[in-house]
């Protein structure tokens, strides 16, 4: 079953803009200054936030429809903005070239060291000249809407005028255009600089993914000036962007709605430093992007609640991407350090075996699942992280530390929420807004524990589908995994009880000794069920790829 086709909002914006251009020219009916009235200001020389003068957007409608562009920009400067962006698109964002002129003049008078970016859907060199005349110090060039040759020629024009360039990318093809542009204009840049902006928002659908910017980290030159664009509304999300190592953060709605409160966002971004949590998310983002390029759609598979070393070996052999171990005294699947030492020995053996056969060994990610951060079991899991026996922690149904918290700098982590009602949906959405790039959702069970085999209400799932990349747990089995994949396209699926052994029925004549023999070890997996699970997953992925 194919997912509904999303509207291509970008195409609509470009069509409307072209119609206005055809009617009024690239001045869009505004008076353009005959000459530039100020020198070009260097764009974002240090790590900082770019705050945006923004009245509306296609996704949110009116944001601050009555804002005064010049006054808002001056407030941004007082709040610590490293640069100021001015949206000049008229139909959907309700900006104008008059805003650009007014902001440039006002900010230069009060804060001459702050550069102004013209943000629009520029398509011709003439628009670069107009931007320069109106006082812009930098221009946005969106690789997605420009052919490579046009991108390069517009970049040359900008640099010839001393303007810096914010080249925005999001798709694989965009990255190639960016690299070609950089090679083409390498000589003669002068003081102007090229920045790489990566948008969390897909301009075609306006859906957000906060990990997309980080997914390109390993494919750009070291030292590239990278800007995290869109989607940040809270100080926690600002900290996440700073934590991930970006040079700049472009913020629109959050700043425009409360210009006088923007300093908290700016400070959080600037103060956040990379840590082990950021390294984990960057690695995951890059791996996920590489996986999509190579395989197309292929969800990550996590097998959770393992207690038997043979099951761990089966997971490795079948290709599980993640293996989960429970560190909660309330769980029958709780494990401790000695078992993780066995796992370490097994992984070393498997790596040696693969090397002897000249095969590639892909090590699964080892996750510790905790339900109470203050419990002895959780403290044991944190120690195992520091000792290299676990890779990350799943905070299951308990508060997860926000990004860039110094106390948690050495603990890679993600949140898992129990979903059973509207309040749980709001909790999930709140975590996303507060800088958690992925949140696992599990069914809320009557026992309060995970791994019960209960399913999430599909009404609730439908409410969050499309809000983020889904990480799903709760009642997933070989019998239903194909339907789940075809309906929801999860990025990760988490299976526990769905592949566990079940005790056979006892005959009436069974005595106590026989009863003992038929007891099943807590968390013990059924190899045949796991084999069937992976086969069903592959079948579903094949169907998704055919639909694509």
Predicted regions and their residues:
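Catalytic cores of alpha/beta
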Residues: 123-135, 172-185, 222-223, 228-251, ...
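Structural preference for beta-strand elements that scaffold enzyme active sites
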Residues: 48-52, 83-85, 113-117, 137-140, ...
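Active-site/ligand-binding-proximal alpha/beta "capping" segment
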Residues: 183-271, 438-447, 453-472, 476-479, ...
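C-terminal helical cap(s) of enzyme catalytic domains, especially alpha/beta-barrels
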Residues: 210, 215, 219, 242, ...
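Active-site mouth loops of central-metabolism enzymes
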Residues: 50-70, 114-123, 143, 226-233, ...
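An N-cap/entry alpha-helix motif that binds or orients negatively charged groups
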Residues: 2-64
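N-terminal active-site wall of soluble small-molecule enzyme domains
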Residues: 60-159, 163-166, 172-177, 213-217, ...
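Glycine-rich phosphate-binding active-site loops on the catalytic face of alpha/beta enzymes
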Residues: 82, 86, 130-150, 189-205, ...
